[in-house]
Regions:
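Short alpha-helix capping/helix-loop boundary micro-motifs
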Residues: 58-64
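Loop/turn positions that initiate beta-strands
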Residues: 71-72
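Short, conserved secondary-structure segments in the cores of folded domains
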Residues: 64-65, 123
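Extracellular/periplasmic metallocenter environments
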Residues: 2-40, 44-48, 52-54, 82-84, ...
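Beta-strand signatures of extracellular beta-sandwich domains
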Residues: 91-94
């Protein structure tokens, strides 16, 4: 019974991360934090805002600052298709669980969009289920995810509650 199991370590990491985010957010501490405007109709949200879906950007921070997200909201992933020597290819995967998210394992993950689907209007994903959704870039065997760059998760909330 001594020692920590993976689940206990994970709970400890999540709790410490939550505490760190809450204490670091000055607006939260001062009570001046304002939630995004609630609407009855589903929202269309561009992942990363004007930055889009690319390397060297914290999507976890973006999700924390732009949430909450609601059931039937649409996440739009915009990224440039790869070109010779100029654009690094990206894709979008839905990871099956928290363990896959933490370890950036693509085993059992579902490819939602390949390297060509983020151009133009982008690839759209509707949050249809009330469960955590774990997203990551799967290019180069998930190296973008492993570097902590292109991954985030959302837990959609129910509207009107």
């Amino acid at each position: 019974m001594g020692g920590f199991s993976f689940a206990r370590c994970l709970i400890l990491i999540v709790a410490a991360s939550t505490l760190a985010v809450c204490t670091a957010n000055k607006k939260w501490q001062s009570g001046s934090y304002q939630y995004p405007k609630y609407t009855q109709a589903p929202n269309k949200i561009i992942v990363g805002g004007s930055e889009g879906w690319h390397f060297n950007f914290s999507y976890t921070d973006w999700a924390l600052k732009n949430g909450p997200f609601y059931l039937n909201d649409t996440l739009v992933f915009k990224y440039d298709p790869p070109t010779e020597n100029t654009t690094i290819p990206h894709s979008v995967y839905l990871l099956p669980n928290l363990r896959s998210f933490v370890t950036c394992s693509l085993t059992g993950a579902e490819m939602l969009a390949d390297v060509t689907q983020g151009g133009g209007q982008g690839f759209e994903f509707v949050l249809k289920k009330w469960k955590p959704h774990y997203f990551a870039c799967g290019q180069h065997d998930g190296i973008h995810c492993s570097l902590g760059q292109m991954k985030f998760f959302v837990m959609p909330m129910l509207r009107g509650y």
